[in-house]
Curated annotation (Swiss-Prot):
Protein name: 2-acylglycerol O-acyltransferase 2
Residues carrying sugar: N206
Membrane-spanning ranges: 24-44, 104-124
Domain of life of the native organism: Eukaryota
Family: Belongs to the diacylglycerol acyltransferase family.
């Protein structure tokens, strides 16, 4: 396979964009492991007392990721995130105003390989979330295990990431002042195994937990479609029923995270690497579905709202797909 090298002469701004995405990729894929190693090294060094002090802090602060986290507007507004968003570029599009008097559950679709669009739009100000949705505080849900990693937890919480456990969602959606927006990648890690260029397969038909949560708390539902999310990485072919897919699904059940075999581009060449390709992401936030608080929803109520949500998501896709290069005969694939 021929390697397609990047040209030597490119605008400095593009180098800054690549650097911004490189630091994100390293943070996403390796920072947690490095933080664990750093803590162990610190524990067995002459500065062991610092590790002990941090361990005490970790014990005291253990539940913070389930109680709204510890966001930092300063971190969210770093200039690096502007370059991160410009790399693809990522665009956040508002189709209807969201009244900050209410709390919301935003269903983000698709998950993609590394949830790039959700991070860029809701964990940073790189695409201007606060300008588009004044009065709303976004919280992207992430697997609880990541918040047990020393040092790494502080970094991810600063960007509005919170634990995805039930108590975390309950805490945020119980805020009577409103203005809380929970962002849930509904398909979860399993959906990453279907994240391939040109495809849009969503795991949604059996996902009703977020629907019940919305009813229980009276949180309005907002479908969000991120066009281009699946085009950022190439993935080894793993059709359902294949040995590779069965192995991936088994490992996902054991470890709780998906393990897609993917590749993108490198820093100095476009053929292979862990950086995502420069392909646009258009994240379209749909109109809110108003939900009446129902503390003990029945199966029929959950099913009815779930069907309405799917219908609104399909409408959002059909309305906007032509704007982003998707053929008119293409439909969402739900499983």
């Amino acid at each position: 396979m021929w390697i397609h090298f990047a040209p030597l002469k490119i605008p400095f701004s593009r180098r800054l964009q690549t650097g911004a995405v490189l630091q994100w990729a390293v943070s996403f894929l390796a920072m947690a492991q490095c933080c664990i190693a750093l803590y162990i090294l610190l524990l067995f060094s002459r500065y062991w007392y610092l590790a002990v002090l941090y361990g005490v802090w970790l014990y005291i602060d253990w539940d913070t990721p389930s109680k709204g986290g510890r966001r930092s507007n300063w971190v969210r507004s770093w200039t690096v995130w502007k370059y991160f968003a410009e790399y693809f570029p990522i665009k956040l599009l508002c189709t209807a105003p969201l009244d900050p008097k209410y709390n919301y559950i935003m269903g983000f679709h698709p998950h993609g390989v590394l949830v790039v669009g959700a991070f860029g739009n809701f964990c940073t100000e790189g695409t201007g979330f606060s300008r588009l949705f004044p009065g709303l505080t976004p919280h992207l849900l992430m697997l609880p295990a990541w918040f047990r990693v020393p040092f790494f937890r502080e970094y991810i919480m600063s960007g509005s990431l919170v634990s995805s456990d039930r108590s975390s969602a309950h805490h945020l959606l119980s805020q009577k002042s409103g203005g809380q927006a929970l962002v849930i990648a509904v398909g979860g890690p399993p959906e990453a195994l279907d994240a391939k260029p040109g495809e849009l397969t969503l795991q949604l038909l059996n996902r009703t937990g977020f629907i019940k949560m919305a009813l229980t708390h009276g949180a309005h539902l907002v479908p969000v479609l991120s066009f281009g999310e699946n085009d950022l990485y190439n993935q080894v072919n793993n059709p359902r029923g294949s040995l590779l897919r069965a192995t991936q699904e088994k490992l996902q059940k054991i470890f709780g995270i998906a393990l897609p075999l993917f590749h993108g581009r490198g820093v100095f060449q476009y053929s292979w690497g862990l950086l995502p390709h420069r392909r646009p992401i258009y994240t379209v936030v749909g109109s809110p579905i108003h939900v009446t608080k129902t503390p003990c929803p029945t199966r029929e109520q959950i099913s009815s709202l779930h069907s309405l949500y799917i219908a609104k998501l399909r409408d959002l896709f059909e309305t906007h797909k032509g704007n982003y290069g998707i053929p008119e005969d293409r439909s969402l694939v739900l499983c």
